[in-house]
């Protein structure tokens, strides 16, 4: 089925926590964050405003941009719409629950998720429109669009609600795995026919927006190893989609790109990421478990460049901005790399807390959200 042409398990969390503790421990000499080196900036980037929302706490919150507005949220229940041109607050709402995931918005409706399964949807003025509860923890931002609000739970459920009324439309349940990562794994619309989602166990699925049934499903990679920890093989981050090609990456697995209409594999490379990748019509870029950033030709998978100068700095999901690759690190630095060769072209500083989510572009303003709730607007010149 031509989707794009036709339409413009119980979680053993302790072990998963141990996996991340091992990966980020500075007591391991191999994991000591690489000191930043000086360089001559060749891209002029200006900080034009700053704002604040609630801290992320233990959870990773992602900003979302629609037009000239950016939507952000924090663990304390704060949800905010900001004018990205000025940094001024348009509206701010306090949800009466601690949040664990957000934000999703189509510019009209805005949705966030709570740890105990609460789904809160706000109208254009920021006032609560409806609330629903799902059975499971929500760590990934809801997806809003095509008349639906779609949420996913840590145990592999994807649930769709009617955007205006909150009526539950369908539920998809992925097969359970013995152990998975408690991390944000987003979703991506494929036109107005399907939604793409990756799952624990390494699977990538295109779900029918009308019914929740799979159009296709394919493995990004397969579990390897003997122990349950060694066999963790989750798709991390949101699947990317440009044209008819979608790419996804797994933890302890592979980076792969696929035909979005059929799920047919186009190419794959050994890779492991806890955050996700970025894609445009020429390259796919991501940081691996060691925070070594690599770029690949999107058509062939050929390696283009590799930058190990951010090794062990826990880089987040990249954003492709013109001729630059932009990503944050564990100390709140925003790094701009040349998309041609991966060298540094600019660097900006925030509040010193981690930047895990991808930056977003709202109008001509690049916006980043830190773990401490700092919202920063930058403009390259």
Curated annotation (Swiss-Prot):
Residues annotated as transmembrane: none
Principal place of residence: membrane
Residues annotated as signal peptide: 1-22
Membrane-topology descriptor: Lipid-anchor
Lipid-modified sites (S-diacylglycerol cysteine): 23
GO biological process terms on file: Gram-negative-bacterium-type cell outer membrane assembly; protein insertion into membrane
Subunit: Part of the Bam complex.
UniProt function note: Part of the outer membrane protein assembly complex, which is involved in assembly and insertion of beta-barrel proteins into the outer membrane.
Protein name: Outer membrane protein assembly factor BamB
């Amino acid at each position: 089925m031509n989707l794009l042409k036709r339409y413009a398990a119980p979680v053993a969390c302790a072990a998963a926590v141990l996996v991340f503790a091992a990966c980020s421990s500075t007591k391991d000499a191999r994991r000591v964050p690489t000191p930043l080196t000086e360089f001559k900036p060749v891209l002029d980037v200006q900080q034009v405003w700053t704002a604040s929302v609630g801290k992320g706490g233990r959870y990773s919150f992602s900003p979302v941009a629609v037009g000239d507005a950016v939507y952000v949220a924090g663990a304390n229940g704060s949800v905010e719409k900001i004018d990205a041109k000025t940094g001024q607050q348009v509206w701010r709402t306090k949800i009466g629950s601690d949040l664990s995931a957000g934000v999703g918005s189509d510019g009209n409706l805005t949705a966030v998720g709570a740890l105990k399964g609460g789904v809160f949807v706000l109208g254009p003025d920021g006032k609560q429109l409806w609330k629903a509860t799902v059975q499971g923890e929500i760590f990934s931002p809801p997806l809003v669009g095509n008349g639906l609000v779609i949420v996913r739970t840590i145990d592999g459920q994807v649930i769709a609600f009617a955007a205006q009324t909150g009526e539950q439309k369908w539920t998809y349940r992925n097969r359970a795995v013995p152990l998975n990562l408690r991390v944000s794994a987003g979703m991506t619309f494929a036109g107005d026919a399907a939604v793409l989602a990756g799952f624990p166990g390494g699977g990538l699925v295109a779900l029918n927006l009308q019914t929740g049934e799979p159009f296709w499903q394919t493995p990004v990679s397969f579990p390897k190893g003997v122990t349950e920890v060694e066999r963790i093989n989750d798709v991390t981050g949101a699947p990317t989609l440009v044209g008819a090609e979608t790419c996804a990456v797994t933890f302890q697995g592979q980076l792969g790109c696929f035909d979005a209409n059929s799920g047919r594999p186009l190419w794959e490379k050994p890779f492991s990421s806890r955050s996700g990748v970025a894609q445009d019509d020429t390259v796919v870029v991501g940081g691996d478990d060691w925070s070594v950033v690599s770029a690949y030709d999107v058509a062939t998978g050929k390696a283009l460049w590799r930058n190990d100068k951010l090794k062990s700095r826990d880089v987040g999901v990249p954003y492709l901005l013109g001729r630059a690759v932009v990503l944050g690190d564990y100390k709140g630095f925003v790094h701009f790399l040349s998309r041609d060769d991966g060298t540094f072209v600019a660097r900006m500083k925030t509040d010193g807390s981690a930047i895990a989510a991808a930056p977003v572009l709202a109008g001509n303003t690049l916006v980043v959200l830190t773990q401490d709730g700092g919202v920063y607007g930058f403009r390259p010149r």
